[in-house]
Design a protein with these regions (language model features):
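Catalytic cores of the polymerase beta-like nucleotidyltransferase superfamily
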Residues: 1-397
Length: 397
């Protein structure tokens, strides 16, 4: 039974009543009821997990060319972002509205689907992955729930629509999505039939692109609690993580103040290496770089080079403490001792600047930068004891 409070929350949701959203409905709802908001925004509103968003998904009976024509007449920018799948994107003020024509799959290969357009809302719902994602809202906030997804959503139950094996055969990425949504919306409690289906499919995932898998894993690793889920993925044969990594991830999650993507990636880099992780999931240079810095800081903390860690990596120091604790197996007392030491130090300041070297005859450029870097490393190696005079006396021209 859907609580009345959840339905009321949907009707008065800020994202729904904002002028830009209502403008999209007015633009596309010529005969009334022809367009509905769909998916995550509706799902998360029902369980009071909405956040400020600049993007909303819509489903419509209108074909893409008609959506584009109506947008053009209204002076609304429109972009054919996924036209082969019936999707165009409208830009209404600061709202990005992804509008997709009602569809049903006519051919799938486990990665992509060929679709045909239609006007049957239930058929459109049936082609989606999980019941909690097949939820729609009209312009007035009235819920349309053809498959009982709202009850599953409220209960935190991630259930495949129809036959789980068939849903996975249509798009094998749904194996990863099953685990991610169970971690984010299912409280890490698995639907038994769904878990059996993804286990059966574990041997057929090699054809998935690293980018698509990486996107799912990145989102999963940024969730507060994923330890149970990662363990289930390993047992199902979906993830091939070595046991030390599984152990580190478990310790990290149990003791970290705010578990997050960056720290978990640092643990993965320690176990799998940067190159292996980059190849496996095609993660961005920013993600890998931040994880590497965090891991380097953690290694310094493990070696009790605490001042150096604080000086070189202040931006990732909090994550580095938790990563070091997981890798080294620190007790809470040991972790508290490191934190106490950090709180009691004053982060040193490198006493030499580029201007100092210019005054000594250096010209601006790579040579100056290299010499400044050499002096800084020498200063760090001295445990920050060398002063400005001693460093300048060591200049190499």
């Amino acid at each position: 039974m859907i609580p009345q409070s959840a339905l009321d929350r949907l009707r008065r949701a800020p994202w729904l009543i904002r002028p830009e959203t209502q403008q999209v409905f007015a633009l596309l709802d010529g005969a009334g009821g022809r367009t509905r908001a769909v998916g995550g925004i509706v799902r998360d509103t029902l369980v009071d997990r909405t956040r400020e968003t600049a993007e909303i998904d819509f489903a419509t009976e209108l074909k893409p060319d008609e959506v584009s024509k109506r947008a053009a007449v209204a002076g609304v920018p429109v972009y054919p972002t996924g036209i082969e799948h019936g999707t165009v994107t409208l830009k209404v003020g600061d709202l990005v509205a992804e509008v997709t024509t009602l569809r049903e799959d006519v051919e799938t290969d486990g990665r992509h689907a060929k679709v045909k357009f239609g006007k049957d809302w239930t058929r459109d719902a049936e082609r989606r992955d999980f019941t909690l994602n097949a939820l729609y809202a009209r312009a007035d906030g009235t819920l349309f729930d053809p498959l009982g997804g709202a009850d599953d959503c409220i209960a935190g139950y991630v259930r495949f629509i129809g036959d789980a094996d068939q849903r996975i055969a249509e798009d094998r990425l749904r194996v990863y999505r099953f685990f991610r949504f169970t971690a984010s919306h299912g409280h890490e409690k698995f639907d038994p039939s769904g878990l059996e289906a993804v286990t059966r499919a574990a041997g057929s995932l090699d054809g998935l692109s690293a980018e698509r898998v990486g996107s799912e894993m990145r989102r999963m690793l940024d969730l507060p609690r994923v330890g149970t889920t990662l363990g289930a993925m390993r047992r199902a044969g979906v993830l091939e993580f070595p046991m030390p990594l599984v152990d580190w991830l478990g310790k990290y999650e149990r003791h970290a103040h705010r578990p997050n993507l960056n720290a978990r990636l640092a643990l993965l880099v320690e176990s799998l290496g940067s190159a292996g992780l980059r190849e496996r999931w095609r993660l961005s240079n920013d993600d890998i770089g931040s994880a590497e810095r965090t891991l380097t800081a953690a290694r310094l903390l493990i070696g009790f080079h605490i001042n150096e860690a604080a000086y070189r990596f202040p931006a990732v120091l909090v994550d580095a403490i938790d990563v070091a604790a997981a890798i080294a197996g620190w007790t809470e007392a040991g972790k508290s001792a490191v934190v106490g030491h950090l709180e009691g130090i004053e982060v040193p300041r490198f006493p030499v600047s580029g201007n100092d070297l210019i005054e000594k005859g250096f010209s601006p450029g790579p040579g100056l930068g290299a010499e400044l870097d050499r002096l800084e490393k020498k200063w760090i190696a001295s445990k920050f004891r060398l002063d400005k005079a001693a460093l300048l006396a060591d200049l190499k021209r």
